[in-house]
């Protein structure tokens, strides 16, 4: 499991006093109000940044970091990820998972027949859909509903599914 979780990507600067526009990659933008620190992944190193101020503008979060007071000091980080530790992640309810924890799970039917690897989670609005890539390179789409997903075991890296008629040709 990953230790650092991406909560946003710096999309551009905002003004000339070192603020940045951040595209949030979290379901709840308001979580930025509770964060005190983030880790900036520059690609070469990871820097701890203290959040001084949080504002919202349309679909963006505007962040001001302590000690960065000039557009020139932050401009070079455009397109870079902002990360938090797993300890600072939101608490999940029963049956909820972080998508990145699901990627790579081995999918199998209830009888133990191997189907392949979970490679992607599509967020459709109604329910998520798991994309399982078979050894033959085909994709099986499994809706994340109780009728289809019987068990998710992160420790064993296993996903047990029930294939209802019509899911696989």
Curated annotation (Swiss-Prot):
Stored Gene3D superfamilies: PRC-barrel domain, RimM
Classification via InterPro entries: PRC_barrel-like_sf (IPR011033), PRC_RimM (IPR056792), RimM (IPR011961), RimM_N (IPR002676), RimM_N_sf (IPR036976), Transl_B-barrel_sf (IPR009000)
Domain of life of the organism encoding this protein: Bacteria
GO BP term, pick one: rRNA processing
Keywords: Chaperone, Cytoplasm, Ribosome biogenesis, rRNA processing
One cellular component (GO) term of this entry: cytoplasm
Keyword Chaperone: yes
Domain PRC barrel positions: 94-167
Function: An accessory protein needed during the final step in the assembly of 30S ribosomal subunit, possibly for assembly of the head region. Essential for efficient processing of 16S rRNA. May be needed both before and after RbfA during the maturation of 16S rRNA. It has affinity for free ribosomal 30S subunits but not for 70S ribosomes.
Protein name: Ribosome maturation factor RimM
Origin organism lineage: Bacteria, Bacillati, Bacillota, Clostridia, Lachnospirales
Gene that produces this protein: rimM
């Amino acid at each position: 499991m990953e230790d650092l979780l991406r909560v946003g990507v710096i999309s551009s600067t905002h003004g000339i006093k070192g603020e940045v526009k951040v595209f949030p990659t979290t379901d709840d933008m308001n979580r930025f109000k509770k964060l005190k620190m983030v880790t900036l992944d520059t690609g070469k190193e990871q820097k701890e940044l203290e959040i001084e101020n949080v504002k919202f503008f349309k679909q963006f979060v505007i962040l001001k970091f302590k000690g960065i007071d000039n557009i020139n000091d932050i401009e070079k980080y455009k397109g870079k990820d902002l990360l938090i530790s797993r300890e600072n992640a939101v608490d999940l309810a029963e049956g909820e998972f972080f998508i990145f924890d699901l990627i790579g799970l081995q999918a199998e039917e209830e009888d133990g027949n191997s189907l392949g690897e979970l490679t992607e989670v599509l967020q459709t609005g109604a329910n998520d859909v798991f994309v399982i890539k078979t050894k033959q390179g085909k994709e099986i789409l499994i809706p994340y509903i109780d009728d289809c997903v019987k068990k998710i075991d992160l420790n064993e890296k296993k996903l047990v599914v029930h294939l209802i008629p019509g899911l696989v040709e």
